[in-house]
């Protein structure tokens, strides 16, 4: 049965979420409308509030309800360390899983000329100004290991070098608990090349 009107619009709207295809979107829609209208109202209100209140941090470009995020506003963070990530989700992952005490800069994407994403779309003019003026001693590149992520890392490394800022790249390789026989060749090669003293 083909849906029309408001139901079809809600199904299509839910498909914008990562990992949500047409069947999952339809199940979500029908659940919210049939069984949990209160939750649907709360979801609608929470989304409206977030859209109204949440924007980008003026300094690092992560999501925040204030002009500066909790990291940039904190006087206890090491301002000489600047970690570059592709998305706000990575800020949360690094903060939750590591002892990192420096600042972040969120690209909200990665260089991808074929998709029309260049340095301007990633706020690299803002980053370059920070490298010039903010006393950054080390730029930590934590972009993904995709082709675009690697190209972005090289571009940022060149930028940092022009300003005399040390650049490091987070290690990539074998996941903790992983077995070598199941690791792809490129990952194994990268891990082998990045070995360190033990």
Swiss-Prot record:
The keyword DNA damage applies. GO terms for biological process: DNA recombination; DNA repair. The gene is recR. May play a role in DNA repair. It seems to be involved in an RecBC-independent recombinational process of DNA repair. It may act with RecF and RecO. CDD domains: TOPRIM_recR. This is Recombination protein RecR. Keywords: DNA damage, DNA recombination, DNA repair, Metal-binding, Zinc, Zinc-finger. Belongs to the RecR family. Residues 80-175 form the Toprim domain. Pfam families: RecR_C, RecR_HhH, RecR_ZnF, Toprim_4. SMART domains: TOPRIM. A zinc finger (C4-type) spans 57-72. One of its GO terms (molecular function) is DNA binding. InterPro entries: DNA_Rcmb_RecR (IPR000093), Rcmb_RecR (IPR023627), Rcmb_RecR_Znf (IPR015967), TOPRIM_dom (IPR006171), TOPRIM_RecR (IPR034137).
């Amino acid at each position: 049965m083909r849906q029309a009107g408001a139901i079809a619009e809600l199904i299509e709207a839910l498909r914008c979420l990562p990992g949500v295809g047409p069947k999952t979107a339809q199940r979500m829609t029908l659940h919210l409308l049939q069984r949990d209208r209160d939750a649907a109202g709360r979801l609608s209100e929470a989304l409206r509030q977030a859209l109204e209140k949440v924007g980008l941090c003026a300094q690092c470009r992560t999501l925040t309800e204030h002009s500066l995020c909790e990291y940039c506003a904190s006087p206890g963070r090491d301002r000489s360390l600047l970690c570059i990530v592709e998305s706000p989700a990575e800020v949360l992952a690094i903060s939750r899983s590591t002892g990192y005490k420096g600042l972040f800069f969120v690209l909200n994407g990665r260089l991808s000329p074929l998709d029309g994403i260049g340095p301007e779309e990633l706020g690299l003019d803002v980053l370059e100004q920070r490298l010039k003026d903010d006393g950054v001693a080390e730029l930590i590149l934590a972009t993904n290991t995709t082709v675009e992520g690697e190209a972005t890392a090289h571009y940022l490394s060149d930028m940092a070098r022009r300003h005399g800022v040390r650049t490091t790249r987070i290690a990539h390789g074998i996941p903790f608990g992983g077995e070598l026989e199941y690791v792809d060749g490129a990952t194994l090669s990268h891990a082998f090349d990045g070995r360190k003293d033990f």
